[in-house]
């Protein structure tokens, strides 16, 4: 144990970061811990004696609990020391194993011991197995073991060498046979050179393989040494854990004895508590009888209140049926209004912009009314939910006897609020009915105006057609007159001797192309010009389409 404690101290010096805050595990520390636990128990003893008039049983319990705590703390410390030393050694050995797999062979055992001394300033500790030191790497026992391993390797190699010699003899005979087949010495030399080159390549490959195998062998030797060290550490940890288990068994026995004593004391306390509990039960029974008398009176009052609530619920159901009928009537009116709106939309598609604006305004009002109807439906659902809540409250009212008066007052207030809301809703329904009636009247007036205007448009179209016919007849007459004037002007140019009186008819003949435009306007004071009449033709259909 002392050698292991020294090893733990050296490991903590080499790796102070791996176990911060842990106490140093040395021979002196291990000897001082029990001595420190004993004064703690002694310190508790006089303190308990100085306490003012404590019972002797309580003092004994405190002393036993303090001693058990000290023992448990000491055992936990020992366990932490074992785990810390073993885990620290494993952490130190882990990176070496990883590095040995991918790197070349490390220096020999002498160099390892030197590096250990350079790091810690102490010689490498020798592990202890079952109270005896394990032989170090430089001891003669280990050298004998290695020599025996080498002798076994040689014995294993001899049959392999014999097999190789037999194989070489066969190859030589085959080579001689091939050389005998050749006729000239030059061919024999060439064959030998080829064979020699092949053997050289094989020899080089074998040397490379030998180097790789040697590296692997050195790595395996290092791993073997490392595993031996870990095995020794595991054996030491096992021995320490066995000792700890024994101490824990002793500690468990003492805990069992304490548990038995506490159980006896608790039984005595339980008997005292039962006697006190019976006395309190008798008092409670007397109080229960008094409360039963009060509860009987409260039940009668609650029955009367329940009858009143039933009457209120029946009245509320009747009012609900009336509201349902009103809503059905509203739905039917809404359907009629929707049908009328569809007809009005079909009729108003061909109206002018003013009619279209008024129609949009009416449609907006209809949408708002629908929205209000939906809000009314939502309020209806909300009222139904409130009714369900009131029924649940009524059931709770029967269960809770003490809070019956408060619940009844709150229910009355809520019923009054509901009646006020219903009155408000009825007023709103009357308002919306009046609005719907006004909108229907406006729609009927618009339809009558449209029919009147359609009749006026038909009369105007008939007048326009008559005017167009008259204009066409006038245009034909004008064309005939123009032709006659042109003929007359052509006959007048032949006689150059004619003077002023013969030139007068040429004036209107020369102005004839421009005169018809002037003559068209006074012919029909009520009719428009030809250009205007030409434009009115396509304009009227557009107005009709609108």
From Swiss-Prot:
Modified positions (Phosphoserine) are 72, 515
One Pfam annotation reads: Taxilin
User: Which GO cellular component terms, listed alphabetically, does the Swiss-Prot or TrEMBL entry include?
Assistant: cytoplasm; cytosol; extracellular region; membrane
Q: Which domain of life is it from?
A: Eukaryota
GO MF, one term, reads: syntaxin binding
* Coiled-coil annotated residue ranges, if any: 186-491
Q: Which tissues is this chain's protein expressed in?
A: Ubiquitous, with much higher expression in heart, kidney, liver and pancreas.
Keywords for this entry?
A: Coiled coil, Exocytosis, Phosphoprotein
Decide whether keyword Metal-binding is in the record. no
Query: Quaternary form?
Result: Binds to the C-terminal coiled coil region of syntaxin family members STX1A, STX3A and STX4A, but not when these proteins are complexed with SNAP25, VAMP2 or STXBP1, suggesting that it interacts with syntaxins that do not form the SNARE complex.
**Family the entry assigns:** Belongs to the taxilin family.
Q: What is the protein name stated in its UniProt record?
A: Alpha-taxilin
Q: What is the lineage of its organism?
A: Eukaryota, Metazoa, Chordata, Craniata, Vertebrata
């Amino acid at each position: 144990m002392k050698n292991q404690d020294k090893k733990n101290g050296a490991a903590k010096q080499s790796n102070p970061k791996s176990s911060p805050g842990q106490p140093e595990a040395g021979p002196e520390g291990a000897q001082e811990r029990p001595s420190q636990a004993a004064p703690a128990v002694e310190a508790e003893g006089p303190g308990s004696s100085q306490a003012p008039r404590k019972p002797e049983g309580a003092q004994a319990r405190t002393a036993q609990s303090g001693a058990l705590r000290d023992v448990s703390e000491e055992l936990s410390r020992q366990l932490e020391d074992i785990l810390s030393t073993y885990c620290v050694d494993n952490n130190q050995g882990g990176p070496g194993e990883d590095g040995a797999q991918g790197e070349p062979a490390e220096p020999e055992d002498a160099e390892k011991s030197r590096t250990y001394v350079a790091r810690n300033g102490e010689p490498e500790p020798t592990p202890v197995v079952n109270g005896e030191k394990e032989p170090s790497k430089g001891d003669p026992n280990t050298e004998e073991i290695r020599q025996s391993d080498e002798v076994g390797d040689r014995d294993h190699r001899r049959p392999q060498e014999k097999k190789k010699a037999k194989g070489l003899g066969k190859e030589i005979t085959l080579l001689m046979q091939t050389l005998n087949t050749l006729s000239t010495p030059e061919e024999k030399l060439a064959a030998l050179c080829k064979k020699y080159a092949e053997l050289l390549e094989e020899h080089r490959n074998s040397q490379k393989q030998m180097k790789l195998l040697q590296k692997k062998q050195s790595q395996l030797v290092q791993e073997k040494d490392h595993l031996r060290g870990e095995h020794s550490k595991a054996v030491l940890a096992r021995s320490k854990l066995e000792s700890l288990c024994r101490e824990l068994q002793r500690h468990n026995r003492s805990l069992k004895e304490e548990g038995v004593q506490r159980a006896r004391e608790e039984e005595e306390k339980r008997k005292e508590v039962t006697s006190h509990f019976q006395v309190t039960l008798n008092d409670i029974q007397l109080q229960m009888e008094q409360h039963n008398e009060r509860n009987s009176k409260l039940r009668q009052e609650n029955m009367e209140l329940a009858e009143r609530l039933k009457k209120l619920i029946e009245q509320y159901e009747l009012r609900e049926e009336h509201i349902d009928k009103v809503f059905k009537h509203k739905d039917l009116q809404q359907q009629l209004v929707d049908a009328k709106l569809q007809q009005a939309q079909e009729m108003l598609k061909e109206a002018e912009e003013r009619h279209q604006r008024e129609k949009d305004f009416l449609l907006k009002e209809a949408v708002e009314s629908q929205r209000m109807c939906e809000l009314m439906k939502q309020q209806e659902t909300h009222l139904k939910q409130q009714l369900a809540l009131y029924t649940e409250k009524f059931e709770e009212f029967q269960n809770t006897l003490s809070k019956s008066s408060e619940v009844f007052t709150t229910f009355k207030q809520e019923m009054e609020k509901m009646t006020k809301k219903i009155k408000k809703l009825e007023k709103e329904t009357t308002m919306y009915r009046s609005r719907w009636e006004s909108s229907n009247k406006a729609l009927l007036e618009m339809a009558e105006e449209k029919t009147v205007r359609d009749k006026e448009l038909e009369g105007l179209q008939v007048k326009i057609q008559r005017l167009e016919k008259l204009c066409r007849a006038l245009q034909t007459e004008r064309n005939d007159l123009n032709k006659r004037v042109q003929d007359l002007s052509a006959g007048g140019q032949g006689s150059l001797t004619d003077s002023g009186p013969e030139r007068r008819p040429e004036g209107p003949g020369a102005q004839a192309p421009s005169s018809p435009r002037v003559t068209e306007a006074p012919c029909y004071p009520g009719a428009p010009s030809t250009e205007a009449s030409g434009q009115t033709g396509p304009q009227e259909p557009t107005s009709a389409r609108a």
